[in-house]
């Protein structure tokens, strides 16, 4: 992998090996523990998700005895839906994308007297920040760390830990080109929402940035790189070939960005965050195994 990237060293933070297969579990545990401790009378929680956030809440809710409802958009990953149900969550399909699912989750919170659990919140950032702390403590001083951006908890945690440790590491956000709301916002210096988020990498398929997350990203990230779905698929294949790890689209996006900036990062010490490995078999076959066809004149 180091040779492929042309870097002096590449450190990969493998969050695909947590009990739920993704980094989100760290935040879910912090959120559920505090809720059970401070508000034990809560009837249950409801949230919107494309999968990993919902799995984290379901797993943590089962551990702390909290009923969990998750709302997913129609067409969501069938395997992530099955995993959430296996962890004990009630799964409801609603709307065409994450934002529509979130609106339904807010409605359910009011109608069923449930606690609405946002996908970006201080407890979630505190929890997921621990993976950055582990990486920065284990790795040599990194010149740059590439982090995918969905709603922003992971990169915000990385920025906060970097600053608390007094490190000079560049934090570089990565988004899919078809769902580049944060990249667009970063360029314009204000929150910019998109009409659609089109990418096979469901973990970064967000069209409405969170204002609090954007403020942290704008102040602490060096830049945001966008990568095509073809580049993400190539990065998934590279991880499998080079490390024998199965990585989902969002988790492979940082490697895709590093490969796109190979010349710029030559000879440097680079960190990559594999945020998860939860990719449907059908999507893996139809997207990742289908290499782009060369143009024919």
PLM features per residue range, with description:
Residues 1-297:
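PLP-dependent amino-acid enzyme catalytic core
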């Amino acid at each position: 992998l180091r040779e492929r990237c042309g870097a002096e060293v590449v450190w990969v933070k493998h969050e695909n090996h947590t009990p739920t297969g993704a980094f989100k579990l760290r935040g879910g545990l912090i959120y559920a523990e505090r809720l059970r401790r401070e508000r034990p009378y809560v009837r249950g929680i409801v949230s919107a998700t494309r999968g990993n956030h919902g799995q984290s809440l379901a797993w943590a809710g089962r551990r702390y005895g909290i009923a969990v409802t998750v709302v997913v958009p129609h067409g969501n990953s069938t395997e992530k839906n099955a995993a959430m149900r296996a962890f004990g969550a009630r799964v409801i399909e609603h709307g065409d994308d994450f934002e529509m699912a979130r609106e339904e989750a807010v409605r359910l919170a009011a109608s069923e007297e449930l606690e609405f659990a946002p996908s970006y919140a201080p407890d979630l950032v505190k929890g997921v920040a621990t993976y950055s702390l582990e990486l920065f403590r284990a790795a040599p001083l990194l010149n740059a760390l590439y982090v995918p951006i969905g709603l922003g908890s992971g990169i915000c945690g990385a920025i906060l830990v970097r600053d608390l440790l007094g490190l000079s590491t560049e934090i570089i956000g990565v988004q899919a080109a078809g769902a580049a709301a944060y990249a667009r916002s970063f360029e314009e210096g204000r929150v910019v929402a998109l009409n659609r988020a089109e990418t096979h990498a469901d973990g970064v398929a967000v069209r409405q940035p969170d204002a609090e997350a954007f403020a942290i990203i704008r102040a602490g990230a060096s830049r945001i790189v966008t990568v095509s779905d073809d580049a993400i698929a190539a990065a998934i294949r590279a991880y499998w070939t080079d490390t024998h790890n199965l990585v989902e689209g969002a988790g492979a996006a940082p490697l895709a960005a590093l490969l796109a900036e190979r010349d710029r990062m030559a000879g440097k010490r680079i960190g990559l965050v594999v945020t998860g490995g939860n990719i449907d078999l059908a999507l893996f076959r139809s997207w990742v195994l289908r290499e782009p066809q060369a143009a024919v004149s």
